[in-house]
Amino acid sequence: MKWEPEIPRWKQVYAVMSERVVDGTYPPGERLPSAMAICDEFGISQVTAKRVLTELRQAGLAYMEPGIGTFASPLPEAPNS
């Protein structure tokens, strides 16, 4: 991944991970990569990876099952136009 120096890395990784949830790469109910797997994929620290997972949960894009992992949340359906 090419890093933008003016944007914090957690925000850049969050953008990638949130897009994967929204576009269905991680469908609802699918387990997301662990913090360690995110570290390996993006070359970031475990603290940064945990921040990404926390931000995904706070945004409603993921939920945690203690002792099991973090999973993609079902997305709200778009209103009919």
Say what each PLM segment does.
Residues M1-T54, Q58-Y63, I68, P74-S81:
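Extreme N-terminal segment that seeds HTH/winged-HTH DNA-binding domains in transcriptional regulators
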